[in-house]
């Protein structure tokens, strides 16, 4: 990294946008990131076009202090603003075949009983293309390099197209459309990556090759494997490692959504793959490395075969989680992932199929009533209390709306412009892409870009307008010294008003979401449906819990339902000071975990005697250590617990000396994360 000051300054400026757009960004497993040495960080799924690399660089800088170089598409690198930021961050441009691909003439097909590498054409002009070009099937069904061209209607590819989708379109009577991308020389990219890695740099890339909004990962490109093998073949003692990173979002395109970055264990490429690569058996070596990376990414991402399955899995997680349990955000992601693994393994089991259909029906009933799952389980039948809560929350919502109104009006031009421009850009990207479903991976990027460009101009205009109004109408005498402070005050005042509106608005939105179920409970015709649905939910909870507890041990040997069902009960909704305490304690945990190289927010594969040691247990204890290593681990765990208890006791003393404010709703509950 040549210009560290420019890197840190630009990252700090853009971090303001990230903190403004996302309500919460968490990291899990950051202790696994090597602090020094060459590192290729492999991130997936690529669900937010330019936001993903920005969050990745920001969290790596905050958590482990490493500056990261990103591989960026040359098409984006040539854009004025994106190129400027990419150069400031030391990004490496990569020319992608799909950016240069052109639509081929006619249709292509293969003969069912013939050579699958022989591609036949109808009304095609294969001789216009060259050997080495890439033949691309639609919807990312597959690609292959052209080995030889025999005529305008016959060519051979280096390897046959594999996969059910590729075979279906190529064997269809009408044939398949296709694109042809020219051969690209990536020597510069490989040399530049190798040069930086040898110097101990951290290179991050997205091996899917582009952003998308699909619920599953796209096939990985071979570039990451070639970069790693090329570096190790020439510098075998450089100590290069690969690190998987899962980019997990809750509604990535929405304002004030949440994100979790999960880092897996570092991978070292086996020597046999490097030897195969040197021996010109590159296909075997590259495929072996890609399989390693793909398996590692599966352990840190949530992969669902389709959107409907993802919704069922998230509903299943809410039904399985006891109401008194409050999961941390990384734990929600981990439980979703394990449920998907279990579903894919047992999806043909009649019990799973029957439960799948029941949950789908339950979700549809929630949608028709306009309710969310956590609102059903928390509804209590007492008309007087329901009416009291409804009136109280409506009054509170009115006051909060008044507080948020000035800032909302000031910022409304940015909101309107960002929404319209992002929708247009998403539509254009969807039209040009063969892998996107709705183009949602573009929305957050363009919302942030529009806000970054418009906000300084808009608030400068407000400041000038304020100064003009005060000077023209002599609201402050021109002879007063305070007249010179007007530009400074107005420059800071309007952003502060907008930020206050943001905080008021968050609380107001949470209260607004809680009003509908209260209103429905007061209507006799709707109340019956709500309470019938509540009974159905109780039955679903019992069925889901029973089935997971039966099937879980078959797939996960260390599965223990008591670790969830016996967790301490969730306390009452925290006050402002209690939330501040929780945030401080979380910070202390992070600091202590770095000190002891232990991630307290992740599942640690400890020996069996240590699995009954809980950080916040009222009476922490451990079984007698069987050897010196376990004893050392127990000592470290006790040290961390004692430090946290002492810190928590000091802060609780401070809190008790203050007046506790009235109960307020400050954030969405865990149950709302995936609704």
Curated annotation (Swiss-Prot):
Catalytic activity, EC: 2.3.-.-
Membrane topology summary: Multi-pass membrane protein
GO BP terms, alphabetized: phospholipid biosynthetic process
Subcellular location: Endoplasmic reticulum membrane
Residues covered by region (Disordered): 616-635, 646-675
Classification via SUPFAM superfamilies: Glycerol-3-phosphate (1)-acyltransferase (SSF69593)
Ranges of compositional bias, category Acidic residues: 665-675
This protein's record includes keyword ATP-binding: no
Domain of life: Eukaryota
Transmembrane segments: 2-22, 397-417, 448-468, 481-501
Record InterPro entries: GPAT/DAPAT, Plipid/glycerol_acylTrfase
Listed GO MF terms: glycerol-3-phosphate O-acyltransferase activity; glycerone-phosphate O-acyltransferase activity
Protein name in UniProt: Uncharacterized acyltransferase C1718.04
Organism encoding this protein: Schizosaccharomyces pombe (strain 972 / ATCC 24843) (Fission yeast)
């Amino acid at each position: 990294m040549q210009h560290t000051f420019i890197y840190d300054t630009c990252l700090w400026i853009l971090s303001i946008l990230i903190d403004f757009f996302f309500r919460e960004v968490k990291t899990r497993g950051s202790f696994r990131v090597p602090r020094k040495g060459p590192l290729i960080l492999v991130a997936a799924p690529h669900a937010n076009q330019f936001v993903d690399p920005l969050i990745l660089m920001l969290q790596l800088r905050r958590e482990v202090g490493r500056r990261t170089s990103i591989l960026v598409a040359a098409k984006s690198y040539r854009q004025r603003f994106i190129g400027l930021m990419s150069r400031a961050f030391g990004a490496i441009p990569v020319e992608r075949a799909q950016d240069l691909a052109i639509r081929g003439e006619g249709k292509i097909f293969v003969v069912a009983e013939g050579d699958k590498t022989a591609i036949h054409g109808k009304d095609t002009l294969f001789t216009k293309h060259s050997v080495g070009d890439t033949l691309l099937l639609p919807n990312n069904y597959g690609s292959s390099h052209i080995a030889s061209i025999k005529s305008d209607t016959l060519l051979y590819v280096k390897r046959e197209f594999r996969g059910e989708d590729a075979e279906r379109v190529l064997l269809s009577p009408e044939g398949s459309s296709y694109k042809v991308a020219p051969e690209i020389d990536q020597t510069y990219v490989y040399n530049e990556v190798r040069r930086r890695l040898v110097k101990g740099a951290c290179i991050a890339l997205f091996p899917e090759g582009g952003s998308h909004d699909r619920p599953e990962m796209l096939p990985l490109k071979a570039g990451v494997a070639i970069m790693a093998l090329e570096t190790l073949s020439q510098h075998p003692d450089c100590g290069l490692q690969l690190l998987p990173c899962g980019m997990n979002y809750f509604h990535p395109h929405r304002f004030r959504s949440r994100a979790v970055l999960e880092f897996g264990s570092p991978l070292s490429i086996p020597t046999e793959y490097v030897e195969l690569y040197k021996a010109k058996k590159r296909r075997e070596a590259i495929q072996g490395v890609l399989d390693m990376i793909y398996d590692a990414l599966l352990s840190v991402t949530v992969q669902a075969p389709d959107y409907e399955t993802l919704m069922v899995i998230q509903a299943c997680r809410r039904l399985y989680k006891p109401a008194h349990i409050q999961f941390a955000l990384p734990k929600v992601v981990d439980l979703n992932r394990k449920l998907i693994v279990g579903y894919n393994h047992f999806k043909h089991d009649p019990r799973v199929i029957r439960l799948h259909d029941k949950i789908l029906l339950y979700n549809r009933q929630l949608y028709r009533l306009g309710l969310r799952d956590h609102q059903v389980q928390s509804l209590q039948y007492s008309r007087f209390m329901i009416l009291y809560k409804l009136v109280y929350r409506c009054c509170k919502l009115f006051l909060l709306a008044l507080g948020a109104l000035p800032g909302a009006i000031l910022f409304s031009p940015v909101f309107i412009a960002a929404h319209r421009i992002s929708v247009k850009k998403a539509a254009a990207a969807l039209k040009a892409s063969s892998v996107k479903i709705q183009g949602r991976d573009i929305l957050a990027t363009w919302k942030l870009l529009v806000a970054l460009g418009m906000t300084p101009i808009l608030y400068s205009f407000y400041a000038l307008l304020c100064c003009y109004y005060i000077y023209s109408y002599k609201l402050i005498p021109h002879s007063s010294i305070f007249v010179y402070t007007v530009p400074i005050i107005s420059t800071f005042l309007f952003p502060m008003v907008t930020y206050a509106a943001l905080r008021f608005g968050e609380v107001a939105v949470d209260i607004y979401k809680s009003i509908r179920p209260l209103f429905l409970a007061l209507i006799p015709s709707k109340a019956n449906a709500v309470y019938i649905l509540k009974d159905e939910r109780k039955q679903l909870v019992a069925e889901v819990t029973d089935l997971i507890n039966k099937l879980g041990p078959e797939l996960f040997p260390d599965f223990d339902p008591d670790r969830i069902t016996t967790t301490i009960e969730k306390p009452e909704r925290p006050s402002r000071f209690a939330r501040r305490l929780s945030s401080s304690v979380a910070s202390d945990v992070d600091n202590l975990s770095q000190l002891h190289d232990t991630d307290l927010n992740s599942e640690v594969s400890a020996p069996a005697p240590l699995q009954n040691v809980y950080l916040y247990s009222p009476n922490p204890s451990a079984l007698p250590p069987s050897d010196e290593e376990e004893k050392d681990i127990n000592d470290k765990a006790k040290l961390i617990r004692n430090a946290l208890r002492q810190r928590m006791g000091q802060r609780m003393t401070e809190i008790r000396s203050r007046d506790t404010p009235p109960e307020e709703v400050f954030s969405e509950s865990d149950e709302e994360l995936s609704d």
